[in-house]
Amino acid sequence: MKKNIVVSCMFLVVVVSFISVVVIIRNKTNAKENLVLAQKQTEIKRGEAGRISDLNFYQKLHQKKDINALIVGDSIAQSTGTSNSHEKWINVVIKDVQKKYRSTITTDPITGGSTTGVRAWVELNNAKLTKQYDVVFICLGQNDQYNIKPKQFRMFYESIIIKLKKLNPNIEIIPIIESSFRQYNDYSNVIEDLAEHYNLQYADTVGAFNNSGKLYSYLSNDLVHPNGKGYVYYAKTIEKVINNNYLSNKKTDIDYSVLYNNTKKLTDFVFDNSPDLNNGFTIENGFIGNKVSENLTFNTTKSLAIIHFLRKPKGGKFKVFIDDNFIKEINTNSTFQVSYSDLIAYNLRGNHKIRIEISNIIKKGSVKILGLVTN
């Protein structure tokens, strides 16, 4: 009897051990199969993501994919002059694209009010972009015509195009000729020439306004920024560009060469926030000075020099000197706070000292310098 019990127990142990081994082997097999399956799914997802990222703006519209858009521009790019967000040209375009193509556009802005091509180039190079953008709307020129020469405007505008193409060769760029020009000029001609060279179809809102049959004062309350009625023409003009390119299945990944020789000066971007001499400025995410005569000095061997600073309420003024020669005085006082870039020189040769010296401070105000941009 005892012998039978012992035999039965031994048999039971063997069975349990066998089952345990089978379970362990099966679990390992399942785990391995799950790992292989997970790897395959990851590869499929990566392949899908890669396939989608290889699609250009218009191909994504054809496939009803989501769109990432970047807006580079000034206050008109922001739709300043509207009474509500629904009147903003970009929101009208987003609504139209959603309705017509069943694609959702997500937008990110770079720069804003008072922007010139100089500031846009600096901000774009300084930005830490985490998305791959499918389309970019460039809305510049209004402020440039009062701040830089056409030959300077064209090299910064072209450098912006090249920078965007380097970020994504498939990116679609839609330049906007701003209605505030009122008539075509040397700055709008730059945009037209660059558009032709880089196979870009621009949105001509000068023509749209002039052919509208409406007085400019009807489409703009301050005779610069469009109002809600004016921005309707922006949206319609941009939508027409998009639709024409959609129907023609436009190719956006193109071979290109630099159009303007001066643009080659902007191949490199260097942001220098370490002055060689600091007399009185406090270091706080930049350099803050609040007394006349406080100064910063940067030594440079580069051809390009741009001062990057903060415009803000209770600002002040500073003078810029190159090798002790006065270049210009810059006013940093503004009704709102915004970073700004001012072109100081772009044809320097040899060694130079650039000195920034506070010349005036508004009561309880300050001047904030962010750095010197060179090439």
Question: Which residue ranges define each predicted feature?
Answer:
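Oxyanion-hole/transition-state-stabilizing segment in secreted/luminal serine hydrolases
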Residues: 119-154
